A protein has these predicted regions:
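Well-ordered alpha-helical scaffold segments within catalytic/enzyme domains
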Residues: 316-332, 380-398, 443-457, 498-514, ...
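Low-complexity, Ser/Thr/Pro/Gly-enriched N-terminal "stalk/linker" regions
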Residues: 21-45, 221, 225, 239-308, ...
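Hydrophobic h-region of N-terminal signal peptides that target proteins for export
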Residues: 10-18
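Non-catalytic carbohydrate-binding regions of carbohydrate-active enzymes
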Residues: 469-481, 485, 510-638, 658-667
Length: 667
């Protein structure tokens, strides 16, 4: 491993908060079959020198651009070398007062995450490959002084190389554009780390809740060849950690010049192809009919006998989607299927207490009184059925029995709400808590607001207001977005999305000062949600399927700290970005909506262009864009099992931009 011997290069960053920045520089050189040798570097004008002659020449350049310093390093080989460059920039901030930010992967200290994932629980210093991050930036916020410090990589044209081994010292098999970013707190003073090519330490995060030995890679330069790597270093101020994330996201978005891709499909073409999923996944022979949506083989897409009202299955929402589409496009088979799902669910999908059955494995039979419910799945089920009931009402049809069940379930919601306005994440059939944490509370806001509009019951609006009071105080004000998803309990993008969605719904049914409050809260949550979505296209090596397909990652979202892959979880968020952008004059949100809309349909499986999926219309879920996998196949591929139920539902909502506003315009 590299020996950590370093001297200091003093570089003056003439920011608005000007001060000298201490940068420690190291060069690692490796010869095949031998341990690497590390050299500390000192600054001599434009050169970086070691205490002895080196087979390389290293030049540095500093260019002031407003309040930032652009720091470039060029390494030129005198003979063939295998090198690794490392830099550490001291912030002067005491670690105890610092929270860190690596977009889409690290928030605060990642203390909501288990010790088996990267967090301060296992180490206070980490380095990560850039493709783990939704933007190639490392930042720190000092809550004692409100000062901030960031290092951002200026990207090279994308290149990637397959690696013969994944840990230890590794000579790369070809060119890569990937460096690394991170932070170091070993001295009690926070420093940001960066370099090229990538290294990951003290551990690599290789799959869910699995840390592995570190890796340091070395890039080859032949005699006369050179490589230039550039970073932007900036200091600033922010009112809070959330404000720091907002400012960093704005700066990154502007600097990267994020633009939509050339979309391969129109919205109508996407929906027409997704209908193949509706037809091929339809399952009968059980008390409830449904579209098989989870635990499905990527290779065969064979249906599996499990039903999920929400979360990964989204069975009720997909039932409404196909019913509505079939009616509009004269496809009676889809209308029949959608009606059969909802009709059978009305008959068999509710428990004795009036809850929806969250999840049913029909091989084991119907759930009993021991069933555990989640506020998220109950909320997603009500959301789907209220859309269905409003649609039917507009067609002149009523469903009194189903309305009564939904009305009763919303009454249960009101009774479950805690004094602080929150809802338990999970609870028993008798209403007692299984997981009393309030991170999923904003899931309940949406059905409460919809129920208020549909049933004209003001109790539901009162309860919804109380959820936002909790949301503001306990989640948005603290920038503590966690535990919205059900397959992890950590910092995750879905928590920020749900917070933005909840406040969006409240804004739609309010006016004046109250509406302005909700718009402000929505915007704060939306910036945080936006930070999870890629603003750049990660590189792939030849032979990695995603790269061979020409896949571009911009607009796709990292899932959570635990699940370091990207996916199409967006649902209404894209429309919320557009709406917020127009309401608050934030053009970046409008642009991000365009990026998402153009990008998230790229992997649509169609006849003759299946994108690695067994059947047309089954949209992929676990898209592995970095050296992390859910258990199989690695970077550039999918996991072997997937849940297309929710991916289809998410894309359907993405390409149905007026659905929510039309619901509230209906009577």
């Amino acid at each position: 491993m590299l020996h950590k011997l370093s001297l200091i290069i003093v570089m003056t960053c003439m920011t608005a908060y000007a001060r000298a920045v201490d940068i420690k520089a190291r060069l690692g050189l490796k010869t095949p079959g031998n341990p690497s040798v590390s050299y500390s570097l000192t600054s001599d004008g434009s050169k970086l020198l070691a205490g002895e002659a080196l087979p390389v020449e290293i030049m540095q350049k500093q260019v002031q651009q407003g309040n930032e310093t652009v720091f470039s390093v060029t390494i030129k080989a005198r003979e063939r070398v295998y090198f690794n460059l490392n830099f550490t920039a001291s912030t002067g901030f005491a670690t105890d007062h610092c929270d860190f930010y690596l977009p889409g992967f690290w928030y605060h200290k990642n203390l909501r995450s288990p010790i088996e994932a990267p967090s301060f629980k296992s180490s206070k210093s980490w380095n990560f490959r850039e493709d783990r991050l939704s933007a190639p930036l490392s930042g720190v916020y000092d809550d004692a002084t409100h000062q901030t410090f960031t290092v951002m990589r200026r990207l090279d044209p994308p290149q990637e190389a397959l690696t013969p081994t994944m840990d230890g010292e590794v000579i790369l098999s070809g060119s890569t554009s990937l460096g690394y970013l991170g932070f170091d707190n070993e001295t009690g003073i926070a420093a940001l780390t960066f370099g090229y090519p990538y290294q990951e330490s003290p551990r690599r995060y290789i799959r869910k809740l699995t840390l592995a030995p570190e890796v340091v890679t070395f890039a080859k330069l032949d005699a006369g060849e050179s490589k230039t790597v550039t970073w932007t270093i900036a200091a600033g101020k922010a009112d809070s950690y959330g404000d720091f994330v907002r400012r960093a996201w704005i700066k990154t978005f502007d600097e990267m010049g994020v633009k939509p891709i050339v979309s391969p499909y129109t919205a109508d073409e996407v929906k027409a192809q997704l209908c193949s999923y509706f037809r091929n996944s339809f399952v009968t022979g059980y008390p409830i009919k449904f579209n098989s949506g989870e635990n499905i083989s990527v290779e065969t897409c064979k249906s599996y006998p499990t039903f999920a009202v929400g979360f990964v299955g989204r069975s009720l929402l997909n039932a409404f989607n196909q019913l509505e589409y079939g009616s509009l496009h004269q496809q009676p088979d889809l209308v029949r299927q959608g009606n059969e799902v909802i009709g059978s669910f009305e008959a068999h999908g509710f428990s004795a207490k009036g809850y929806m059955h969250d999840f049913i494995n029909f091989e084991k039979g119907m759930p009993g009184n021991e069933e555990v419910h989640t506020i998220r799945q109950q909320s997603e089920g009500i959301y789907a059925l209220l859309h269905y009931l409003m649609y039917e009402r507009k067609q002149g049809r009523t469903h009194k029995a189903l309305e009564k069940k939904i009305h009763h379930l919303l009454d249960i919601f009101v009774s479950l709400q805690k004094p602080d306005g929150s809802f338990a994440r999970k609870f028993n059939e008798d209403g007692t808590d299984v997981d009393g944490s309030g991170g999923s509370t904003p899931s309940a806001t949406v059905p409460l607001v919809m129920g208020y509009h549909y049933f004209k019951d003001k109790r539901y609006l009162t309860a919804a207001r109380r959820t936002v009071d909790y949301l503001e105080q306990s989640i948005i004000a603290r920038s503590d977005y966690f535990s919205s998803t059900l397959d992890a309990n950590c910092e995750d993008k879905e928590a920020a999305i749900t917070a933005a969605t909840a406040t969006y719904y409240m804004a739609l049914v309010s006016s004046g000062r109250e509406q302005r409050r909700y718009i402000g809260l929505c915007k704060r949550a939306a910036y945080f949600a936006a930070s999870w979505y890629y603003l750049w296209d990660v590189p792939f090596a030849q032979g990695q399927m995603l790269g061979d397909l020409g896949f571009k990652s911009r607009g796709w979202g990292n899932v959570s700290v635990e699940n370091n892959h990207i996916d199409v979880f967006v649902f209404e968020l894209s429309h919320i970005f557009r709406w917020l952008g127009e309401k608050t004059h934030e053009p970046r949100f409008v642009q991000l909506d365009k990026v998402m809309t153009s990008s998230l349909c790229q992997l649509l499986p169609t006849p003759g262009h299946l994108c690695g999926i067994g059947k047309p219309g089954y949209y992929p879920e676990v898209v592995q864009h970095t050296t992390w996998d859910y258990g199989r196949n690695g970077k550039g591929f999918y996991n072997n099992i997937f849940a297309p139920g929710w991916t289809i539902a998410s894309l359907w909502e993405l390409y149905s931009p007026e659905r929510t506003e039309k619901f509230f315009q209906s009577k």
